[in-house]
UniProtKB/Swiss-Prot annotation:
Residues 217-227, 275-284 have a biased composition (Basic residues). Coiled coil: none annotated. Residues 285-295 have a biased composition (Low complexity). The gene is PAR32. It comes from Saccharomyces cerevisiae (strain ATCC 204508 / S288c). Present with 1140 molecules/cell in log phase SD medium. This is Protein PAR32.
Length: 295
């Protein structure tokens, strides 16, 4: 028969009531166990806390200064505030607090939900508050964007593969005879953005070196179909076959001439003629004559 042990029962209750509290971002040392649910900002007061004299009692009583954690990990996130003591935290209902001073001290202060924020139609006050906050943030971000000088629009591109190869716009004749813009492959918005910022494009090679993409001065490849010019390709991206630039950047460093192909063909014919002459010389030797005698 099992006997009742009050000590084991107390230990079981203590295990149930334990809380795991995290006071930072770094390492496992910021997780500790607590029997009570502590404040997320104020750490429990310990014996190693600094003491400060109470000015009201002429320094006769000593009060311990609470410690605070600002949540970045390590011992550097714990600091002492000698002005905020335990007695200072005990607020009575009759105390007059200037909340405007509190709001000004906090950068990301969000006002509580009050009666004037709730619409008469009975809309959700939380949604209403969020909409006001989002509207304020969007106004601030818009003001910051327009006020900053030389603010260039960013170019969002892919990370490699065939999807980051675009074609430049060209003029084609429509059925009515008017010229229209035609884009083959890619998105129209992306194409317009890239064409407007061609000077700011960068080519990222496989070894991670970034080279400025300069407009190519080489001749465009001829198209077999008359009246149609091949669109100018250029690729942007970080990996895969998409970081091979043609013809905008890769042809800047490679001087390709169409006459080189003709010279290569001529050299190939010359080499073939030399090989045939060598074979004839071998056949006209002494051993070749002996072979013909026995054959």
């Amino acid at each position: 028969m099992a006997t009742f042990n009050p000590q084991n029962e107390m230990e079981n209750q203590a295990r149930v009531q334990e809380y795991k509290v995290s006071t930072g971002r770094g390492g496992a040392g910021n997780i500790h166990k607590s029997m009570s649910k502590p404040s997320p900002v104020l750490l429990p007061l310990k014996s190693n806390s600094k003491t400060v004299a109470n000015n009201n009692n002429n320094g006769s009583n000593q009060e311990k200064v609470p410690r605070f954690a600002i949540g970045r990990g390590g011992a550097g996130n714990i600091f002492h505030d000698p002005h905020l003591t335990r007695s200072a935290q005990q607020l009575d209902s009759n105390d007059n607090i200037n909340y405007n001073d509190v709001i000004n001290d906090i950068d990301d202060y969000i006002s509580p939900i009050t009666s004037d924020m709730v619409d008469e139609g009975g809309s959700n006050p939380v949604t209403n508050t969020r909409s006001r906050i989002s509207a304020t943030r969007s106004h601030q971000s818009l003001h910051a964007t327009t006020s900053s000088p030389n603010n260039n629009a960013p170019i969002v591109v892919g990370r490699g593969g065939a999807g980051n190869i675009f074609f430049n716009k060209k003029k084609v004749a429509s059925n009515g005879g008017n010229e229209e813009d035609e884009i083959r492959g890619g998105n129209i918005e992306d194409e317009d953005t890239i064409n407007a910022n061609e000077d700011n494009l960068f080519v990222v090679t496989s070894n991670g070196n970034a080279l400025a993409a300069i407009k190519s001065t080489s001749k465009k490849p001829k198209n077999k179909l008359k009246g149609k010019s091949a669109p100018e390709k250029f690729a942007i991206g970080r990996g895969g076959a998409g970081n091979i630039i043609s013809p905008k950047s890769s042809r800047n460093t490679i001087n390709h001439n169409l006459n080189d192909d003709d010279e290569d063909k001529f050299n190939l014919k010359d080499d073939n003629g030399k090989e045939k002459k060598k074979k004839k010389k071998k056949k006209s030797g002494f051993f070749s004559s002996l072979k013909t005698m026995f054959n």
